[in-house]
Amino acid sequence: MDKKLSIAIDGPAAAGKSTVAKIVAEKKSYVYIDTGAMYRAITYTALKQNADLTDEAALTELLKRTEIELVSVPEGQIVLVNGEDVTEEIRKDEVSNQVSIAAKHKGVREEMVKRQQQLGQKGGVVMDGRDIGTHVLPDAEVKIFLLASVEERAKRRYEENKKKGYDVNYETLIEEIARRDKLDSEREVSPLRKAEDAIEIDTTSLSIAEVAGKILEIVEQKSR
């Protein structure tokens, strides 16, 4: 029987992490943990309560009082905040554009990492984010770092948003993704960076199926 591995998939905004991670988890019958959704959930909660996203102490305290659940359903995964389904709300631009502000706080990240490590401790998980291979699951057997050009990532996000009926502008998305890259890469706590033992995959000219296929091949090799 194949050994149950921990799979860490990192990369910048809109590199295809979540989509690929879901496919890999489904093919392997592993649990998928979308850490980005957890940061989006606290950002959404703070915005809803008119909390100051730059106030680290207040945001950390709010997070400690907030229950965030990732629930598997036949269609994928739903995100609950204190029992309320916020799956759609957390994907809106208002949250996307401000999640990096909430995610840069040390107190917030420490609490999130603690929760994520508890979720991933038994193996058999696929976890995606910015600091999974470097910080959350540093001992993961499989570490992947996905890359894609800013233009390609903006194009993907544009098409994704159009499908959902959101009003979007391609040039604005390029600016927003570049700004998020800068915030994620330059933050003091757990910045976006590739783990030394991660395998890098440039997804710019690859389909989602091709990227998932490459990762599954790596997983098969490590499972033996």
From Swiss-Prot:
CDD domains per UniProt: CMPK
An annotated GO cellular component: cytosol
EC number: 2.7.4.25
Keyword ATP-binding on entry: yes
Catalytic activity: CMP + ATP = CDP + ADP; dCMP + ATP = dCDP + ADP
Protein's cellular compartments: Cytoplasm
UniProt keyword annotations, A-Z: ATP-binding, Cytoplasm, Kinase, Nucleotide-binding, Transferase
UniProt key word Oxidoreductase: no
InterPro entries, per the entry: Cytidylate_kin (IPR003136), Cytidylate_kinase_dom (IPR011994), P-loop_NTPase (IPR027417)
A GO term for molecular function: dCMP kinase activity
Broad EC category: transferase
Binding site for ATP: 11-19
GO biological process: nucleobase-containing small molecule interconversion; pyrimidine nucleotide metabolic process
Similarity comment: Belongs to the cytidylate kinase family. Type 1 subfamily.
Name of this protein: Cytidylate kinase
Organism: Bacillus velezensis (strain DSM 23117 / BGSC 10A6 / LMG 26770 / FZB42)
